[in-house]
């Protein structure tokens, strides 16, 4: 017999369904559920008196080879491909299905490969939001404590370079040379996150670059502090093309070896990832932003300029002087710093993100950026732009399109750009189960739980001496997946194809699983999902005013931001 339930009661029990809307944190961003994979009346739910019991939603005949290891029930999923509600099935550390889990012997509509059995444990996703683990592709490995900070904010993959607090690492994301690379690969072996190292790409001779690829780097960083000349760019891209790795570029702020046009000429038709294209983080002054126009250049922004506020400009001067080893008592050093900081390009950056012209947001960790703010800054920018411009033309009664555009900036697009999208970057069957769970009220600020390779590695947790898990203080803590040898199965070290094929990990004693980057050279900005626009950019060299497709861009700085004081004491 059919039983009708009030919508508000249904939401309390099973979470929202099709047509229901959710506010993200305290922003003005509203999502709407596009599809619900469940069969009404056949929802799976764990607990006393609920239906995930033997012979009901749990198939008593399903052995380990056919049952899920873990199921997340009735969770809202936000991903580039949709905003939906359903169950997430995990097996052998990978997502095997997004749909309807349960017992097909007694339930209708159970998705193949999503059988709940005696081998299955349950994470209740009712009322929660699931997203793919974030990917930060601009990490200065200055201190190991960054990794835990990033993890607790929902970042499960770090790509960048460095060897600790050296002058080079504090300024550039380079792990230079085989000896340093091997030491860093060993150093990160026990961290419960995915990591890929970038080598130093600044060489006008190919052999030192080839040595670094063979030592395992997933790409190169070309940085002006090491000399970002046209010859260096050309040489590095030749090696990258030969070995199928990516190149990240921080261009020549002082225009010593050429202007932005010379850099574009040196790049040719080859693909690369252009860091902090607004320019405050470094790059041809005042017009590095022009690289956004080209389909073979994948542009990104870093957290310190996102979004543009009344405080952004003023905090940059001291930050820049320290990070690039300048002397505030030397006039020429101060002038160099000032030349890189322009409010007009900072304002235009927000606009270009909102129209999908800048593809990625990453941190620039401890080198003018904050690793724990990648996700928060992304959604603050989206919220700021909605407050100013209203809904996007593609949105009607919700903000689904804008939300898909912005979540792609730190999930699927960096994965595509760096050759790891076949493994991670979205919640899709066949990919590693790197999943972050959020309460809607805390979305983008403080996760509830972080699943890495199908196993819980971090979660909010109360007093360990309490009778239940919830008594205060409730803080994010590492869970069992972050300890012991479990890390070797749940986390991955990304390496070059050469390193992987020659099993160099075994020769140097790496225990963690290694996977090769692929398809770094046959992509373009056109592959950046929801973020592949190629607007015409012009910059007035006297006033630094920015024109996009002929229109002057004048986005006001934010006076206050959401997702801030309501959530944090400091």
Swiss-Prot record:
InterPro entries: Amidohydro-rel (IPR006680), Metal-dep_hydrolase_composite (IPR011059), Metal_Hydrolase (IPR032466), Urease_alpha_N_dom (IPR011612), Urease_alpha_subunit (IPR050112), Urease_asu (IPR005848), Urease_asu_c (IPR017951), Urease_Ni-bd (IPR029754)
Single GO BP term: urea catabolic process
Underlying gene: ureC
Binding site for Ni(2+) 1: 138, 140, 221, 364
Ligand binding (substrate): 223
Gene Ontology terms for molecular function: nickel cation binding; urease activity
Catalytic reaction annotation: urea + 2 H2O + H(+) = hydrogencarbonate + 2 NH4(+)
Residues engaged in binding Ni(2+) 2: 221, 250, 276
Active-site residues, as the UniProt record annotates them: 324 (proton donor)
Subcellular location per the Swiss-Prot or TrEMBL entry: Cytoplasm
Organism: Caldicellulosiruptor saccharolyticus (strain ATCC 43494 / DSM 8903 / Tp8T 6331)
CC cofactor note: Binds 2 nickel ions per subunit.
One matching Pfam family: Amidohydro_1
Cofactor dependence: Ni cation
Stated name of the protein: Urease subunit alpha
GO CC, any one term: cytoplasm
Residues with the N6-carboxylysine modification: 221
Pathway entry: Nitrogen metabolism; urea degradation; CO(2) and NH(3) from urea (urease route): step 1/1
Entry EC number(s): 3.5.1.5
Family from the record: Belongs to the metallo-dependent hydrolases superfamily. Urease alpha subunit family.
Keywords: Cytoplasm, Hydrolase, Metal-binding, Nickel
Post-translational modification: Carboxylation allows a single lysine to coordinate two nickel ions.
Keyword Lipoprotein assigned: no
Quaternary assembly: Heterotrimer of UreA (gamma), UreB (beta) and UreC (alpha) subunits. Three heterotrimers associate to form the active enzyme.
């Amino acid at each position: 017999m059919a039983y009708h339930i009030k919508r508000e009661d249904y939401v309390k029990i099973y979470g929202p369904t099709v047509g229901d809307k959710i506010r993200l944190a305290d922003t003005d961003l509203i999502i709407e559920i596009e599809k619900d994979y469940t069969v009404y009346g056949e929802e799976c739910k764990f607990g006393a008196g609920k239906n995930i019991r033997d012979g009901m939603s749990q198939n008593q005949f399903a052995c380990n080879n056919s049952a899920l290891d873990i199921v997340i029930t009735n969770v809202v999923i936000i991903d580039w491909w949709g905003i939906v509600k359903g169950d997430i099935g995990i097996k052998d550390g990978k997502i095997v299905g997004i749909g309807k889990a349960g017992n097909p012997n007694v339930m209708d509509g159970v998705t193949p490969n999503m059988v709940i059995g005696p081998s299955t444990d349950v994470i209740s996703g009712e009322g929660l939001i699931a997203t793919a683990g974030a990917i930060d592709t601009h990490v200065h490995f200055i201190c190991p404590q960054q990794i835990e900070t990033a993890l607790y904010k929902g970042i499960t993959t770090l790509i960048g370079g460095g060897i600790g607090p050296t002058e080079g690492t504090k300024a550039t994301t380079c792990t230079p040379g085989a000896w340093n690379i091997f030491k860093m690969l060993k150093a990160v072996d026990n961290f419960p996150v995915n990591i890929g190292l970038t080598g130093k790409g600044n060489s006008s001779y190919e052999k030192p670059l080839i040595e670094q690829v063979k030592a395992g780097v997933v790409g190169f960083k070309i940085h002006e502090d090491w000399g970002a000349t046209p010859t260096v760019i050309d040489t590095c891209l030749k090696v990258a093309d030969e070995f199928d790795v990516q190149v990240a570029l921080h261009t020549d702020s002082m225009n010593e070896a050429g202007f932005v046009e010379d850099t574009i000429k040196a790049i040719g038709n080859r693909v690369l990832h252009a860091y902090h294209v607004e320019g405050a983080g470094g790059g041809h002054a005042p017009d590095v932003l022009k690289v956004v126009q080209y389909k073979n250049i994948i542009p990104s922004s870093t957290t310190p300029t996102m979004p543009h506020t009344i405080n952004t400009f003023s905090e940059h001067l001291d930050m820049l002087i320290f990070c690039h080893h300048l002397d505030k008592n030397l006039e020429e050093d101060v002038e160099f710093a000032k030349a890189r900081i322009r409010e007009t390009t900072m304002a235009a950056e927000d606009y270009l993100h909102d129209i999908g012209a800048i593809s990625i947001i990453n941190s620039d960790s401890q080198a003018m950026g904050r690793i724990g703010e990648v996700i928060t800054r992304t959604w603050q920018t989206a919220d700021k732009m909605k407050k100013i411009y209203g809904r996007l033309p593609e949105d009607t009664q919700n903000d689904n399109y804008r939300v898909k555009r912005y979540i792609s900036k730190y999930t699927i697009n960096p994965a595509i750009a760096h050759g790891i999208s076949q493994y991670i970057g979205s919640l899709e069957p066949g990919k590693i189960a790197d999943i972050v769970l959020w309460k809607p009220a805390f979305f983008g600020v403080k996760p509830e739980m972080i699943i890495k390779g199908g196993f819980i590695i971090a979660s909010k947790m109360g007093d360990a001496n309490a009778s239940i898990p919830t008594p205060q203080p409730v803080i994010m803590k590492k869970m069992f997946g972050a300890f012991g040898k479990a890390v070797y199965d749940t986390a991955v070290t990304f390496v070059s194809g050469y390193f992987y094929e020659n099993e160099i990990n075994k020769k140097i004693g790496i225990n963690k699983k290694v996977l090769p980057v692929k398809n770094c050279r046959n992509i373009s900005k056109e592959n950046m999902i929801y973020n592949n626009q190629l607007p015409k950019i012009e910059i007035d060299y006297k006033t630094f005013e920015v024109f996009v497709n002929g229109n002057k861009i004048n986005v006001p700085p934010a006076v206050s931001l959401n997702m801030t004081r309501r959530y944090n004491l400091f």
